[in-house]
């Protein structure tokens, strides 16, 4: 479905929606790419925002009021309809002791803008971007890999603009990328990319992305590959080796809180980031800030699981061709290898790497 939020009078709305419906039935793919629009309410006219939903099955049009969240959200699809941008104010509870956003805050914002992008093109709100076919077959998206590079952390009160888009990733998954900017200066302050795979919600087994599902979301993806990071020799593609015992640093017996479960009933992927950081040595936390984090998600973690976080220092890895960290690693940077595992049987939950740089002088 395609959602159009516009401020129009009833008569103008009827004429516009008839045109939209006819155009969509004639050529739905090109219609979506040409005609996605978003109009915000204006105080001058006092008109109420309306939402038009064009059905891909019948070409029918349903009119309804935009939600309050739609009206307040500072985000919209870009002009071509193939990516989504949203602005966020960094709040007091999203910063650490140095008054800058934490990496968990950044990861939560990435997740939020991704979900809002999915909603803006008509995907389900009862899960993470599920399509009609996915809901019929009880399928959900789960994170397979997350890679985040932060060049400059936003401070309390700063406004961050995040752009996101998704695209196909082979036959078994999809990819979502993000670019973060300072809303005032336009400076790129971070980039991220992720890989998602499909899971059956009942059996908890991975499943290939069917052509039906692919057809439902590809119309909202760039036709040509668009990547936040260049593909050649970049850190986001590097294979992560498994950390073997004995680890240099560890935090044993971590337990998920009820609040750590997401709407798909497993531990939210941002929680794993916090667990990984729990075993970073305090002297690094005091003098460095996280620059790059890459995580591979190996298995689900349930509410009753008990988790061990293991960390070991690793040798330097080469720069990231085209990314802001390329060629900037120096003797003041520190890199670590991480492993999250079940305390009981040692099953691997997550493996990762982090790169830390010296904190800027205040």
UniProtKB/Swiss-Prot annotation:
It is an enzyme of class 3 (hydrolase). It is found in: Plastid, Chloroplast. Its EC number is 3.1.2.14. It comes from the Eukaryota. GO terms for molecular function: fatty acyl-[ACP] hydrolase activity. Residues 312-331 are annotated as: Disordered. Its main location: plastid. Residues 1-38 form a transit peptide. Residues 315-331 have a biased composition (Polar residues). The keyword GTP-binding does not apply. The active site is at residues 264, 266, 301. Keywords: Chloroplast, Fatty acid biosynthesis, Fatty acid metabolism, Hydrolase, Lipid biosynthesis, Lipid metabolism, Plastid, Transit peptide. Transmembrane segments: none annotated. It catalyses: (9Z)-octadecenoyl-[ACP] + H2O = (9Z)-octadecenoate + holo-[ACP] + H(+). One of its GO terms (cellular component) is chloroplast. GO terms for biological process: fatty acid biosynthetic process. Plays an essential role in chain termination during de novo fatty acid synthesis. Possesses high thioesterase activity for oleoyl-ACP versus other acyl-ACPs. Substrate preference is 18:1 > 18:0 > 16:1. Belongs to the acyl-ACP thioesterase family. This is Oleoyl-acyl carrier protein thioesterase 1, chloroplastic. It comes from Arabidopsis thaliana (Mouse-ear cress). The gene is FATA.
């Amino acid at each position: 479905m395609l959602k159009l939020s516009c401020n129009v009078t009833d008569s103008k709305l009827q004429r516009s929606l008839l045109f939209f419906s006819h155009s969509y039935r004639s050529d739905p793919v090109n219609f979506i790419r040409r005609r996605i629009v978003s109009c915000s309410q204006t105080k001058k006219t006092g008109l109420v925002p309306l939402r038009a939903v064009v059905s891909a099955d019948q070409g029918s049009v349903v009119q309804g009021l935009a939600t309050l969240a739609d009206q307040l959200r500072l985000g919209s699809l870009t002009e071509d309809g193939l990516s989504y941008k949203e602005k966020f104010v960094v709040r007091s509870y999203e910063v650490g002791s140095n008054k800058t956003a934490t990496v968990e805050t950044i990861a939560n914002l990435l997740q939020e803008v991704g979900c809002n992008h999915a909603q803006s093109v008509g995907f389900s709100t009862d899960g993470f971007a599920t399509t009609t076919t996915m809901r019929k077959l009880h399928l959900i998206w789960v994170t397979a890999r997350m890679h985040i590079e932060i060049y400059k952390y936003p401070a309390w009160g700063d406004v961050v603009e995040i752009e996101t888009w998704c695209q196909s990733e082979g036959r078994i998954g999809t990819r979502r990328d993000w670019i973060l900017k300072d809303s005032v200066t336009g400076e790129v302050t971070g980039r991220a990319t992720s890989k998602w795979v499909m899971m059956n919600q009942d059996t908890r087994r991975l499943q290939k992305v069917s052509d039906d599902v692919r057809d439902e979301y590809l119309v909202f993806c760039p036709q040509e590959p668009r990547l936040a990071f260049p593909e050649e020799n970049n850190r986001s593609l590097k294979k992560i080796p498994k950390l073997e015992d004995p680890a240099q640093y560890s935090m044993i017996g971590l337990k998920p809180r009820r609040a750590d479960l997401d709407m798909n009933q497993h531990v939210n992927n941002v929680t794993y980031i916090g667990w990984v950081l729990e075993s970073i040595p305090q002297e690094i936390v005091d003098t460095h800030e996280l620059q790059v984090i890459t995580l591979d998600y190996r298995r689900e973690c349930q509410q009753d699981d008990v988790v061990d976080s293991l960390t070991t220092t690793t040798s330097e890895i080469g720069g990231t061709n085209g990314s802001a960290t390329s060629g900037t690693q120096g003797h003041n940077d520190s890199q670590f290898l991480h492993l999250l595992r079940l305390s009981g049987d040692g099953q691997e939950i997550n493996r990762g790497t982090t790169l830390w740089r010296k904190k800027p002088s205040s």
